[in-house]
From Swiss-Prot, chains A, B, C, D:
Top-level taxon of origin: Bacteria
GO cellular component: cytosol
InterPro entries documented for this protein: P-loop_NTPase (IPR027417), Thymidine_kinase (IPR001267), Thymidine_kinase_CS (IPR020633)
Protein name: Thymidine kinase
Lineage, top ranks: Bacteria, Pseudomonadati, Pseudomonadota, Gammaproteobacteria, Vibrionales
Active site: E88 (proton acceptor)
Sequence positions that bind Zn(2+): C145, C147, C182, H185
Catalytic function, reaction form: thymidine + ATP = dTMP + ADP + H(+)
HAMAP family linked: Thymidine_kinase
Compartments (UniProt record): Cytoplasm
Record-linked Pfam families: TK (PF00265)
Assembly with partners or alone: Homotetramer.
Length: 192, 192, 192, 192
């Protein structure tokens, strides 16, 4: 029975590396994984999953209008898929997370989703909210705060490194925009 | 460093039993745990945590207005607390979940929260939403669907056992109102 | 696909309570679980699993000569089993753990095993060794050291509470014989 | 409080990639991790941790005589260590695993150990045995069997791909020597 996994973490934990390693494991055994990532994330070029550690692979793109069930079904009918891997899954919509449960339940294809848990205001992204609600397995990928404790929150900083407490949920950026911190230092940075 | 745990499950998985066992473990070592439960849940009498398997213990009550940080701090100052255990934590508000992070971060008291993940419409309760967002550890307590697979969703049924797809989020009830099922049988029961 | 779980912990973590709750969950859905425990453990009467919190249930017994595959197969043929629950699984032999993998792999019956990880000398029991080797899922049931940290080791004490560093691996006893402690206090108690 | 983690898996699951990503996470925050690997493993050159996916880093070497506590303490005194990462940890001796618990308990440095669980005969390696006994956290890194299920066992094959049921525990090799499989196909391959 296929299952849906949500691998969640703060930023810079190595989600994309873990995704690419899983994909490698499937291919190494002659299997056919399909990789998707958010069209919104053009940090490293469109249609690519890249990890800061130096790995990358081609990826299908999804945006808010994509019907991921249909897209995956089409790929599966062209060539049997053994697994789908979704990077930046926090950018999925509620409907797309539901479509992914159908990929798992109806097409019996495992879905491994990798993404952030909360935004810089500590609120769930829509995709994360419904993955946390419906996924079979919730697995935390760990990274560390500057204090050495586990980091599970994300601060958005301005160009002076000062934490920002308002603004749009999404402003794609690498290290210079976001910092992963523990809950204590998150509160401290936002003066809570 | 104290941590916040969210022990989540569908209904009838033994959350209260697990809570009572943890409390027992602390007391057995001469430590002082405090138990809280939702005032809304009067199935087994007010101010009590009871498990269907036959265990029960006195519990402090919280409702939407309770400041759980103040309530716990007061108890802690009267007699050092080694842990707080929250049953029916899905009924916490966003603000109360935040107050609990302060109990953990500022008073360094571990908080073990036990509750449902999603309601009969597959939506997160407010308490579950913010525990899934901010807790240090997410631990699933397993129970089974009638088909033998893991149950991670909840159906609300009418007196004829037919699944209901509308109504208030909360209608406190035991086996006769709610059934825990796997995702596939959840969809089937709601004709999805 | 059935799986083999090893729920391990130090002493007094509530393993038997957790086992009895799982059994209750299966029965509540009209399913048929079978409970086994070690004949060697006569603390609460033979053929019974009891938890210090006050719960108990009848149990089939196994000793070193029992062929658990045959015993389970016989029960299964008499009335379909949905799950087997093994208490005190540290007392299983290597061969019996292998037989349990056959119950899972050949009879497709889930096996939930509950037991200690290491003895008072920090060495694995034979049953624990092969469950740690072959089980599909390793799940820790937590309990606490007198210092508040997680307890993952066990000290055997004499009647004066002084830790003992030699003697037979097995001397069945309750609180008065054994104390669960964290690794640091384990080393301290044994003067390491 | 530092903890000891044992990241275990069958072969070709990406243990080295995960280790290198953890190391990268620490360095990215200006911290100083130390990497160790077994001198016995010269597949990719001595003193190097390499992952099949194309990543590598310098590593300190340990062999059966190395006192890892002294080696780490020396590094720590030269420049504060924030974490030690041990690859091929199955090749540690019992004494070396104990020394690592002292690194965690006495020097308060987290130890992340990555390695195999069982050998081609289904028996624990010495290092794995004592990590499974004493580690604070046991985390499984997943890979897949040719049948699509999770692989948790390892077959050693001859040049014709036929499973071998005897021979030394250690014969360092890549894909051509070892294949990770699920328990069912492990038994099948060895004619059990």
């Amino acid at each position: 029975m296929a299952q849906m996994y949500f691998y969640y973490s703060a930023m810079n934990a190595g989600k994309s590396t873990t995704l690419l390693q899983s994909s490698f494991n499937y291919q190494e055994r002659g299997m056919n994984p399909a990789i998707f990532t958010a069209a919104i994330d053009d940090r490293y070029g469109v249609g690519k999953v890249s990890s800061r550690i130096g790995l990358h692979a081609e990826a299908h793109l999804f945006n808010k209008e994509t019907n991921v069930f249909d897209a995956i079904k089409e790929l599966h009918e062209a060539e049997k898929l053994h697994c789908v891997l979704i990077d930046e899954c926090q950018f999925l919509t509620k409907e797309q997370v539901y479509q992914l449960t159908e990929v798992v339940d109806k097409l019996n294809i495992p879905a491994l989703c990798y993404g952030l848990r909360t935004d810089f205001l500590g609120e769930l992204f829509e995709g994360s909210k419904y993955l946390l609600s419906w996924a079979d397995k919730l697995v935390e990928l760990k990274t560390i705060c500057h204090c050495g404790r586990k980091a599970n929150m994300v601060i958005r900083t301005d160009e002076h490194g000062v934490a920002i407490a308002d603004g749009d949920q999404v402003a794609i950026g690498g290290n210079e925009l976001y910092v992963s911190v523990c809950r204590r230092h998150y509160k401290e940075a936002l003066g809570k």
